[in-house]
Amino acid sequence: MKWSYTPEIKGVSFKVDLQELVDLCLPSCSFLATRETFCVVNSILKERLLLLLAWTGKYVFWNVYGDCDNFGMLTGHTNAITDMHFSTDGTVLYTASADKTVMCWDTTSGTRVKKLKGHSSFVNCVHSARRGPSLVVSGGDDCTVLIWDVRKKRPATTLQNTFQVTAVTFNDTSEQVISGGIDNDMKVWDLRKNGLLYRMRGHNDTVTGLSLSPDGSYVLSNAMDNTVRIWDVRPFAPQERCVKIFQGHQHNFENILLRCSWSPDGRRVAAGSSDRHAYIWDTTTRHILYKLPGHNGSVNTVEFHPKEPIIMSVSNDKQIFIGEIE
């Protein structure tokens, strides 16, 4: 499939008719920022396509169904935003920042609900629990993994790592946390015992992104060794937990924390790349399905829409592309 372009669109002055996307070449539309480099993008919140852009200390919401409405801006962080994640129901947004804090935002009102302090250095990653209590995990340059009960301002649990933590996520039951860092290892922490349960070794460089599969059985990792891997995190899995390795994308001297993601049906995985392409692989064959060009800088994040066959990619070139993949 050819990846071609509509004319570049600045700001929010355009329309997207999802009924017509099947007849369009990709991407269907693009955003061009006028400020600092984008860090994060995500698409969630019920059945709408919600585009959320981040630059230094700020988030802007755009609804890109029909008339493109800029319907909110969140301000509060005093340094770069490094990561974000929505709650399962889409009502709360959790953000991590180089200002050493994690913030919780009400996505309906656009107000800050909580400011979580506990890290002593940059916070690199944040993730909320998929089910169970309202827990959030964050990791930072202070070599800690912090577990937060969002009803309180101080961390409920501190897990001490040896090196800086660059990626975190919960397992499906929210009884374990998976972390990755500059020591190349992925660690699974037992929250009932507040200790390390086991390690998963295989990457030869910093782990930059983690994503739990839709069924909760596997975790996807992206690393600076230029591999994306799938790991079996089910109880009583074989000792060799790395079950798939995907190659083709690249990391470079910029050492950006490139993230990764699953498609809603678990049949595809995606990752950003420093070679200016967005990569999508088939999880069964491990073949590259799409190598999508167009960006003029490292692609930091590639996200799947939760309902439609649509992806969004975000890059250091201050652009976000939205397009159909099938």
Where are the regions a protein language model picked out?
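Per-blade loop-tip surfaces of WD-repeat and WD-like beta-propellers in eukaryotic adaptors/scaffolds
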Residues: 11-12, 17-27, 61-81, 87-91, ...
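Beta-strand-rich domains and repeat architectures in extracellular enzymes and scaffolds
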Residues: 31-56
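Loop/turn segments within WD40 beta-propeller blades
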Residues: 41-47, 85-90, 96, 127-133, ...
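Conserved strand-to-loop turn within each blade of WD40 beta-propeller repeats
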Residues: 53-56, 95-99, 138-142, 173, ...
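Loop/turn-rich, solvent-exposed surfaces of beta-rich toroidal or solenoidal domains
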Residues: 251-280
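Blade-level signature of beta-propeller repeat domains, shared across WD40, Kelch, NHL, RCC1
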Residues: 303-326
